Structures are given as C-alpha cells and as structure tokens.
Amino acid sequence: MRAWLLLLAVLATFQTIVRVASTEDISQRFIAAIAPVAAEIPLASASGSGSGPGRSGSRSGGASTSTALAKAFNPFSEPASFSDSDKSHRSKTNKKPSKSDANRQFNEVHKPRTGQLENSKNKSKQLVNKPNHNNHNKMAVKEQRSHHKKSHHHRSHQPKQASASTESHQSSSIESIFVEEPTLVLDREVASINVPANAKAIIAEQGPSTYSKEALIKDKLKPDPSTLVEIEKSLLSLFNMKRPPKIDRSKIIIPEPMKKLYAEIMGHELDSVNIPKPGLLTKSANTVRSFTHKDSKIDDRFPHHHRFRLHFDVKSIPADEKLKAAELQLTRDALSPQVVASRSSANRTRYQVLVYDITRVGVRGQREPSYLLLDTKTVRLNSTDTVSLDVQPAVDRWLASPQRNYGLLVEVRTVRSLKPAPHHHVRLRRSADEAHERWQHKQPLLFTYTDDGRHKARSIRDVSGGEGGGKGGRNKRQPRRPTRRKNHDDTCRRHSLYVDFSDVGWDDWIVAPLGYDAYYCHGKCPFPLADHFNSTNHAVVQTLVNNMNPGKVPKACCVPTQLDSVAMLYLNDQSTVVLKNYQEMTVVGCGCR
C-alpha cells in the first residue's frame, strides 16, 4: 500500500512539472524510466496482502520498490537532461524516441564519466596485478568474499526487466563502479599487514591453505644474538674460562687413552664426580689433561732410541687446581717372533724402563746434571701394553717453579746387565722414516689429574637424600618399592631439555659430547603427596598446611632431587686435550620439596 501511495505522489508531482514545461517528450521519458518499477509493484503488493506474515512481506516489498525507484532516478542509470537542440528536433518530428536513440544519447551525456571510470578501472587493475608476495594470500581470501558479497547485493537490488539495452548498459556501468572501487580499498588495507618474511617460501611451495604457525617453526629456531652472548657467558663461567679457545681442530689428534677414559666414565654409573684410574690415587680429581712432548734443539743431544729427554709444558693448569696424580704413558711396538725367540732367557726377554726428574741442568766442563729417580717398570718383549710411570713429584715441582721445568729423562735397559736395550721396543722418539700421523698415535703422553675445588664434598648419592629424615633418604642404587603411579602430565616429573653446543658455535673445540640432555623438573605437587614424589617430611607438612590455609604458606615446589655429572672432552687455548667431569649438570630425579 505504501508503494502505491508513493507512486501516486510521484505521478502528481510529475503532472505539475508537465503543466509547467508543456512538453510531451519529458513525460514519455519518465514513463519509460519507471516502467521497470511498475512491473514489480503488483508482485510487491501481492506479497503484502493479507494479515500475519503477509504484513512483513508488504514491508519488504515496499523497501524493494523504494530501492528500485531510487535506482531509477540515479544519475548513473538515467540521463538527467537533454540539450535544447535535441528537444527542438523531437518537437518538430513529433516521434517517440526509440531505445537505440536513448542508448546513444545516454552514452554521449555520460561519456566523460565513463572515461573516468575506465581510468579508475585501469589503475585498479594495475594495483591488483602488481605482485605483492607478502599480501597475496590474504588478498585472495578477502577478494573472494568481497566479490561474492557484492554480487549478491547487486542481484538483490537489480530491477527486473524484460529486455532493454539501456538498462543492460547502465547495469554494466554500475557493476564496474561497485566492483572495481572496493578492490582499491582492499589493496590499501592488505598493504598494511606484515607477513613474516619466511612465510613467502612456504606460501609459494604449499599454497595458502597450509600457511600456519606450525609451518613457520618447522625449521630450528635460533636464539637472537643477545641471548647467545648471555648463554656463552654462563657456559664460560661454568667451564672456568674467560673466552672460548680459537684452535684448528684438524691439526689435533685426540689420544686414544683419553677416548677410552671418556668412554669408561660415560659407560659406568659413578657415585661422585671423581675420575677413577687404576693404580693411581685420583680421589676427588675431576679434570684430566694430556700433554705432548715439545720439540727443541736439545733433542739432538739424545740420538739413541733407548735414552731420551721429554719436555712437557704444564703452564695451562690453573693455579687454583690441586694436582692429585700425574703419569707418563709410553707405547710399545710389537717385536717379531724371531726376535723374541732368540732371547730365550727370561732375563733377556725383559726390559726395565726408568724415568728421572731432571732437577738441575749440567754445564759442560763445570758440572754434571742432577737426576731424581721417580719410577721404574719392568716390561716383557712379547707384550705391547702401554707403560705407565708415576711422575707426580716432578709435576708438583714444575707447578711450584715453572722456570725449573727441565723435563724428564727416560731410559730403557736390560734387566740383568743394565745395558741399553738393543731393540726399538719402547717408543721414546720418532724414527727418521716414520710418518707424522703415525707418530702422533705413538708419541709419549703426560696425563695430569687435578681437582678444581668447585664440586661439593658430598657425592651424588648424598644429594638424593636431601634433608635428613625425609622420604628421599634412599640412595640412587637402592631399589625402590614398586608403586602404582597414575599418568598425570601436570604433576611433578622430569622433562627433556637438550643443550646443543653448536647453538653457540662451540662444536669446533668441544670434542664430546656435542650436546647433552640436562632435563628439568616441572609440575604440580598435589595434596596428599604420594610416595613417588620423593618428598621430605618438611614438604609433607608444608603441603598439609597449604591445603588447610592456602593463603598462609605456598605449595611444595617441584625441584631436582638427584643430579648427576657430565664428562666433557674438549681442547683449550694451548691445544691441550682436557677431560673434565662437571658436577650437577643433568637431572636424574624430581620431587616435591
């Protein structure tokens, strides 16, 4: 009904204009303009007849009619005026304008505007076609939604008509306006969105549907430089170093005894940080260093294979470390069975190895050098085992007075006659025709066992006991009672935490391990505390009070209850191979304390 009233009002207004203008041409144009609207009015009114739900349909029909009328008077869809020459021509001919003429006149009147639309359209296409890798993914999704929404909006508001070329042309013009213009706005919106740089390759390879956070963190994330600096400082303090060593790893050979000792430490569960060494008092020693002989001109004074001077530079041992043991290791070459058989006598098949500390050098023509016998060993010719000699007194003297380090003198002789050994069995020096690489595995080595004093007096099994009298008083070798433990992921337990030395660029001087699992403790300590939480009596009482009055005391904390040491094999600035057992480096067990 409202639509009819609105139409009558428009007709009345038009009649007034016709009387004033006195022209038939304008009337005909108006009728042609509102013809599509009139075609829709019966449908709208029909849907609005009746009561109940039909009333809502009437309101919607009126809204559609109003929209259609507004589009009929839209300056983009109907000519606003005509020229005087055109009106006089139509008055003289007294002809009804055809649809082709109306279409031609519409194009002439709106030619400037159409040109502007074409320019805007071209600019829009340039912006859309311009490659924008950062925003390509989100633009595609927004453009599809925007185009679908605008197409639906255009179809719902487009007036129904049988066939008219004028309406078809203006429909395409309106579509070009309401489709191209939002594309410009869309491009400006998406241009302000920052997409991570490493997302470009992911979007290009896998497409927009796989662009996710998991894809971005597929590669290993590296800490930022400032974090790496702090990590490096902390590790250097832990290793008791001022700076990481700068060495050429390719020129250094790791001695086989050091490798075997490292494997022995890592392959056995130790009760403390002490490094065991059969035959030596290495109690509380946590650091082992290996030294090689330093060549000098003095070597030429000992041309024979049975007597040689060895010099080791031990200045790299820190002054705050206490020497626990020192040994000289000599390798032996296997002799042929014919040589061993030719020396059938028991005394002739055994050699004696002696090592002296050179306490004073000699002066030619004035005094003889002074020697102090340190150790002696008897070896058999049919064996190739390493010979170990105790030289701790000499190393102690060198550490106290580095300028009086004159080296060690080693002699190999027969047991019975005490004559020089006739065969090149115990290796003291390099042969003239021997390759350098082979000699590096055969050369004499000095091993020092020191204690840096940084570890606590108690062992690892004492740490597991925690506070005396608690439930955690068991040592880690004592078997535990079987307990039925529920799988609660949020309760106190041990979690993995892998430390990779390559993250700080230390894999060039750390021989082994390249990384280790330090673990950490995390989780809740619920009330009541079960036996598997390895809690102390104090933790039980604290948890009980917290359950009664949470604001008075906090809950017990999930902390490490057992810690173990980690052995590391690395090189220092002097290219010395160091084997060190670091205390409390990895978590063995967790509990509520």
Curated annotation (Swiss-Prot):
Residues 56-70, 161-174 have a biased composition (Low complexity). It comes from the Eukaryota. Keywords: Developmental protein, Differentiation, Disulfide bond, Glycoprotein, Growth factor, Secreted, Signal. SMART domains: TGFB. Residues 1-15 form the signal peptide. Gene3D superfamilies: 2.60.120.970, Cystine-knot cytokines. Disulfide bonds join 492-558, 521-590, 525-592. GO terms for molecular function: cytokine activity; growth factor activity. Expressed in the imaginal discs associated with establishment of the proximal-distal axis of the appendages, and midgut mesoderm. Belongs to the TGF-beta family. GO terms for biological process: cell differentiation. Residues 16-461 form a propeptide. Acts as an extracellular morphogen to establish at least two cellular response thresholds within the dorsal half of the drosophila embryo. Required for the proper development of the embryonic dorsal hypoderm, for viability of larvae and for cell viability of the epithelial cells in the imaginal disks. Acts together with scw. Residues 145-158, 473-486 have a biased composition (Basic residues). Residues 98-111 have a biased composition (Basic and acidic residues). Residues 125-134 have a biased composition (Polar residues). It comes from Drosophila simulans (Fruit fly). Glycans are attached at residues 122, 347, 382, 534. Residues 45-174, 459-489 are annotated as: Disordered. This is Protein decapentaplegic. Its main location: secreted. GO terms for cellular component: extracellular space. It is found in: Secreted.
